[in-house]
C-alpha cells in the first residue's frame, strides 16, 4: 500500500490524497461502504463499482464466526470469495466483540466472549486477530484495540489506552504477510490527554496508517469534533487518517476539513432499509403519506439510476408493502449520494473552496435534517490547523 498527499487546502486541514493498493487506487477523502458479512446489504459488487466505490469494509469478527476465516482462506481470500475486485479493509472486530458479544471478559492477554449467534465461547488475542485478518486477505487490516463503552471513568479509559498500545505492539510483532497494510487505532474517549498519549504511542510503532476510534458512540457532535481537533494534527501527515464508524454527511465534511482521509459507516444502507433517503436539501422519509401520489424523483438534482427512473410514489409503495426491491433501490440512491458528496468535497478542496462548500451545505440541509444534531454541528466552530501551523476558525452562522 502507498499513500500520497496530492494537495493541501490553505484554509482548512483538508487534503487531497491517493491511496494505492494491489486492488486499485482510491482518491481521498473517501467514504467506505460497510459490508460486515462480506456484502453491502442490498447491493452487489457490480453496483458498488458503478457507483464509483473502490474500497469496501468487511468485518473480521463476523467473518470469523461465519463462515470462518479458514473457509475464506480456502476459497482464495475475501476478494475471490466475495467477487469484489476493488480494495478491502477489514476491521479487527474489537468494537463488535465489546458491543455485541455476551459475557465479554478483557485481560491484557486478550478477550474471552460468547458468540452473539449461538453462545459458543471464544478467546481472541492480538495474535489471533492478526491471524484471522491475514487469512481473510484484505488490503488493509486494523490492529486489535480496546474500545470502551461511553461514558466511562477516566481510569477505565486510561487502562484501555494502555491495553490498546500493548495489543498494537503484539499485532505488529505477529505479522507474517508483507502484502497487507496495518493501521493502528487511536483510543482515549473524550480525554484530550489520553488521545494524545494513544496517538503518540501508536506513531512510535510505525503503522502504515492511523485510525481514530471510539467516537460516534453517544457523545455530542461538538465533543467528537473536539477530539478530532486534538488527535488529527498529531498524526503523521504522510500517512492516511481514518475516522472509524462515522458517516453522517455533516461528519464527512467536518472530518475532511480536519484532515481525515477515510470514513466508514453503515448509514447509507441502514437508512435505506428504514426508508430514510439523503438528498441535496435534507432527508426524505419515504414512508410518510405525503409521498403516496408524488411523481417527483427522490431528489430532482440527483443523477443516480433510481432518481432517473422511479417516483417517490413508487418508492413509497415498495416500502409500505415491504418489497425487497425497496431496500435495494433506497440503498443504491443513498450510496450514490455519499459517493457524490465525497466527490464534491474533493472538488471543493481542489478548488480551494471547502469553506464556502461547507457553508452552503448547512444552508441547504441543516433545517431539513431528521435530527437536531445537524443544527448543533452548524453552530460548532471549525478549528483548523493551517499548513504553517497557525490556528484559525471557520464559523457557520445559521440563518
Where on the chain are the PLM-derived regions?
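Non-catalytic, usually N-terminal nucleic-acid engagement modules in DNA/RNA processing proteins
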Residues: 1-176, 289-292
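C-terminal extensions of enzymes
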Residues: 1-18, 26-30, 42, 145-151, ...
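Conserved, mostly hydrophobic/aromatic
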Residues: 24, 56, 91, 133, ...
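A non-catalytic, amphipathic alpha-helix used as a structural packing/dimerization or gating element
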Residues: 128, 132, 159-170, 197, ...
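Structural signal for hydrophobic packing residues in well-ordered secondary-structure cores
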Residues: 137, 168, 172-175, 206, ...
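Glycine- and acidic
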Residues: 150-151, 158, 209-215, 324-327
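Glycine-rich phosphate/ribose-binding loops and adjacent secondary-structure elements
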Residues: 162-165, 174-298
Amino acid at each position: 500500500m502507498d499513500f500520497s498527499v496530492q494537495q493541501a487546502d490553505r484554509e482548512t486541514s483538508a487534503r487531497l490524497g491517493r491511496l494505492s493498493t494491489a486492488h486499485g487506487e482510491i482518491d481521498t477523502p473517501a467514504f467506505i461502504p460497510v459490508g460486515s458479512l462480506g456484502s453491502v446489504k442490498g447491493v452487489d459488487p457490480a453496483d458498488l463499482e458503478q457507483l464509483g466505490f473502490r474500497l469496501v469494509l468487511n468485518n473480521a469478527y463476523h467473518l470469523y464466526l461465519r463462515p470462518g476465516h479458514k473457509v475464506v482462506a480456502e476459497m482464495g481470500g475475501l476478494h475471490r470469495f466475495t467477487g469484489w475486485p476493488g480494495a478491502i479493509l477489514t476491521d479487527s472486530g474489537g468494537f463488535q466483540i465489546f458491543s455485541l458479544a455476551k459475557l465479554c471478559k478483557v485481560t491484557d492477554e486478550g478477550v474471552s466472549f460468547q458468540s452473539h449467534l449461538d453462545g459458543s465461547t471464544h478467546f481472541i488475542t492480538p495474535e489471533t486477530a492478526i491471524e484471522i485478518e491475514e487469512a481473510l486477505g484484505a488490503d488493509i487490516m486494523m490492529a486489535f484495540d480496546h474500545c470502551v463503552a461511553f461514558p466511562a471513568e477516566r481510569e477505565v479509559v486510561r487502562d484501555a489506552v494502555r491495553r490498546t498500545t500493548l495489543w498494537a505492539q503484539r499485532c505488529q510483532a505477529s505479522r507474517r504477510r508483507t502484502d497487507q497494510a496495518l493501521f493502528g487505532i487511536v483510543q482515549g474517549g473524550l480525554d484530550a490527554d489520553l488521545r494524545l498519549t494513544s496517538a503518540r504511542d501508536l506513531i512510535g510503532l510505525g503503522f502504515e496508517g492511523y485510525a481514530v476510534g471510539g467516537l460516534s458512540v453517544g457523545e455530542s457532535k461538538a465533543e467528537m469534533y473536539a477530539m478530532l481537533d486534538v488527535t488529527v494534527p498529531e498524526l503523521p501527515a504522510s500517512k492516511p487518517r481514518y475516522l472509524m464508524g462515522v458517516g453522517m454527511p455533516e461528519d464527512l465534511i467536518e472530518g475532511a476539513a480536519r484532515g481525515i482521509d477515510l470514513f466508514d459507516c453503515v448509514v447509507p444502507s441502514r437508512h435505506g432499509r428504514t426508508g430514510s433517503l439523503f438528498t441535496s436539501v435534507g432527508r426524505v422519509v419515504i414512508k410518510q403519506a405525503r409521498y403516496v401520489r408524488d411523481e417527483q424523483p427522490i431528489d430532482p438534482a440527483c443523477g443516480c439510476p433510481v432518481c432517473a427512473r422511479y417516483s417517490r410514489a413508487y418508492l413509497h409503495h415498495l416500502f409500505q408493502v415491504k418489497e425487497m426491491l425497496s431496500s435495494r433501490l433506497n440503498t443504491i440512491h443513498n450510496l450514490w449520494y455519499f459517493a457524490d458528496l465525497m466527490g464534491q468535497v474533493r472538488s471543493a478542496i481542489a478548488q480551494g473552496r471547502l469553506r464556502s462548500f461547507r457553508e452552503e451545505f448547512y444552508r441547504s440541509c441543516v433545517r431539513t435534517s431528521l435530527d437536531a444534531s445537524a443544527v448543533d454541528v452548524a453552530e460548532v466552530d471549525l478549528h483548523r490547523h493551517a499548513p504553517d501551523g497557525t490556528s484559525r476558525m471557520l464559523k457557520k452562522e445559521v440563518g
